[in-house]
Every structure is written in C-alpha cells, then in structure tokens.
Design a protein with these regions (language model features):
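Exposed, low-structure sequence patches enriched in small/polar residues
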Residues: 1-200
C-alpha cells in the first residue's frame, strides 16, 4: 500500500481573547495493492478493491480559548473518501480545575457512502489528567468505537525529570461490547518503561 497526504490551512482567525476559527483542505492519495476491509460490523463488510484513489476533504473548525475553565471545539468535514463521499461532525468539551486537573469528552460522527457499501461510525473519547507536579502526572483515556463495538482504556503514570525522561507506567485494556458476553476482555497489557538521557 502506498499513501500520501497534503494539508493546506488557507484561512484562520485568531481572536485576541484566545481560540481560533479556520478552514483547511486535505488531499489524500492511496494505492492499495490488495483488497482491504474498511468496515466490518454487525454482519456487514465493506471492502476497498486495489487501485489508485485520490480524494479531497474540506474542513471548518472552531476552537475556543483552551485556557478558560470550560472550553470546546467543533469541526465539520466534507468531501471524498476513496471513490465515495464522506461527511463528519466532531464536538469536544473540556474543563480545568486549577492547574492540576484537566478533563475532556467528545463525539465524532462519520457518514461514509461508497460504491461498495454505506456505513457510519461513532467515536466517543473521555480523558482525565491530574498533575501532582510539573513533572509527575497521571492520565486516563476511555474510548468507545461503535464500528468495532469495543471500549478501550489507557492509564498512564509519568514520573519525569527535567530532561523529559524518566519512569512511565502504562495499563491498557480492550473490551468487546457486541458479543454474547458484553464484558469480554480482548486484551490487557501492563508496561513499565524507564528512560534516561546519558551524556557522552
């Protein structure tokens, strides 16, 4: 598979009080050499055949001042997707409590219409982070994807030094919500990583 992407942010307004509004366009090109599945859920499968595909997507987005207690963003995207049509809307809301607690949640809804089939996808992420100090923090992400009918979670503890290296402790979990057992665990991992910068 050979892919390329071009991004052009041709219009943007940045108010003095923070945030921004803008428009941009993305150009995609893909040359799959074998058929691949782009959607497979609820007994429905959509397959992209081999070939050369080029398409464009145009986006409008608004992002409010992220330094305020409550902030948000909205994005609308429309254009092509391989040899079909694509539309999506995305909303995100965030809050902060002092300098330590940050949280956000969002919703992305995609509508894709191809010659080989139509489908939609919903993605719902929720994030929460707490900073003990400027170098120590814990972050949690829980995300639902209706295409795969899965809930994934990620929890990361970071204890860093001033060079940005240090100790990372990460827990990952994936669960299936579509099977007969709605809490079937598809995978778990527990990772401990330590990095240190060495001068020679």
């Amino acid at each position: 598979m050979q892919t390329s992407q071009f991004h052009w942010h041709y219009f943007e307004i940045q108010p003095a009080k923070g945030g921004r509004f803008g428009e941009f366009v993305d150009r995609f090109q893909d040359r799959p050499t074998v058929p691949f599945v782009v959607f497979n859920a609820s007994g429905k499968k959509v397959v992209i055949p081999p070939g050369l595909y080029t398409w464009y997507q145009f986006s409008n987005e608004y992002i409010s001042d992220p330094s305020t207690v409550i902030s948000g963003s909205a994005r609308y995207r429309t254009g092509g997707f391989y040899d079909g049509d694509y539309k999506s809307i995305e909303f995100t809301g965030a809050f902060r409590a002092g300098n330590r607690i940050l949280g956000s949640t969002g919703w992305t809804h995609q509508i894709i219409d191809l010659r080989y089939g139509n489908f939609h996808n919903d993605l719902i992420p929720m994030k929460l982070s707490y900073s003990f100090t400027t170098l120590a923090s814990i972050q949690a992400l829980v995300q639902y994807n209706n295409q795969t009918a899965q809930v994934s979670s990620n929890i990361r503890l970071a204890l860093l030094n001033r060079s940005g290296t240090g100790l990372f402790v990460v827990y990952n979990d994936r669960r299936d919500t579509y099977s007969a057992d709605p809490q079937q665990v598809l995978g778990r991992s527990f990772i401990i990583k330590y990095t240190r910068l060495v001068d020679f």
